[in-house]
Amino acid sequence: MKKHAIIPIFIPHRGCPNDCVFCNQRKITARTTAPTADEVKNTIDTWLTTLGEVPTVEIAFYGGSFTGLELEEQSSYLAIAKEYKDRGLIDKIHLSTRPDYIDKDILDNLKAYSVDTIELGVQSFDDEVLRKSNRGHTSAAVYEAVSLIKEYGFEFGIQLMIGLPGDSLETCIYSAKETVKLKPSLTRLYPTIVIDDTELLEMYERGEYQPLSREEAITRTAAMYKILDDAGITIMRVGLKSTDIIGEGGSINGGTYHPAFRQLVEGRIARDEIEPQLDRIVDEIRERRDKSCELIANHLQGRDLVNESFNQQRLSRVKVDVFSSPKWFSNAVGNGGENKKYFEEKYPELSIKFRVDDSLEAAQFRINCNT
């Protein structure tokens, strides 16, 4: 049974005066109408009729800088959500905004309307990356916003982007580690894509920006994922959905988009965990076979007999079982079976079977060698 459902309400970026290089919302907003109160209610009612029995239901206001809207407009939307919460029809109210659009007046208003979670579009903790991305604030704004949010007792989340101008593996890891220090309830990881009507597209066309390859994006995101996951932080999303692209109002002109990007990342994490265990097994097998062939060579007469015995040893494949939790079984095999293919090519000595072990946790793997 589904444990958590989100009812998304998209609010255009009319509250955000900034021009981040990756965002085209200021241009889209000119031709996008904000939802009316009736439209918001209809959206919520429609979702509620389809959800069934779900322990936790959230109304989430997406679209960027919700707290950048005029306070009166924020309140009009929040009043609708609070009504559903007061009636017991939903459990939480969630919104996303910029770190520099948090102050005590805003938080007082959010508290009055029973908001639970504030998600901050941090994108990076590296000031040079923020500057090159024209974010309009430094990392100091993040620390200040989080301090205030904690003071008021809200849950908070952090969104990070991978592959912004000036970004690197080192700055990505730094951002993940700084996130851990702040102890958010949730995170989202988004590889940068280049969409229409953005400064980033112009930079790309001028040769001033190079999007990450898929391999680079997977490597960096996997490194960040492991840091956050090891700290026990919930990773709500990895990569954009196709509906996110539509919501952003543009087609992709560069960067990493894959409908199953999370599985690509989790599959890489699985491979990185399984591979050293298989390496050790293969090293032991090769060592045993070398010793076996040496013993055979000492007892057999003639080069042909020795070579024949050696080749038989080489052709004998060792059966190995790779166990994972049910939830991570597909990640062990890899998206499209890519991990399975990778291991088969790297370890011709092994006959590998992927199996489920209910006792294992997510991202835990056990190897059984049937020698």
Question: For the regions a protein language model found, what residue spans apply to each?
Answer:
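Short acidic/His/Gly/Ser-rich catalytic and metal-binding motifs that mark active-site loops
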Residues: C16-C20, I195-E202, I246-E248
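N-terminal pre-triad scaffold of radical SAM enzymes
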Residues: M1-T29, K41, D45-G63, T67, ...
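Conserved non-cysteine loop/helix-boundary elements of the Radical SAM core domain that shape
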Residues: I28-N42, G63-I218
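Short acidic/polar active-site loop segments enriched in Thr and Asp
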Residues: V57, D91, D116, S185, ...
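Short helix-terminating capping/connector loops at secondary-structure junctions
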Residues: G52-T56, R87-I90, E287, Q313-R317
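Short glycine-enriched loops at secondary-structure junctions
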Residues: P12-G15, Y190-I195, K241-S242
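A generic secondary-structure signal
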Residues: T43-T50, I80-Y84, N109, L148, ...
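Auxiliary Fe-S-binding modules of radical SAM enzymes
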Residues: K2-A5, G207-T371
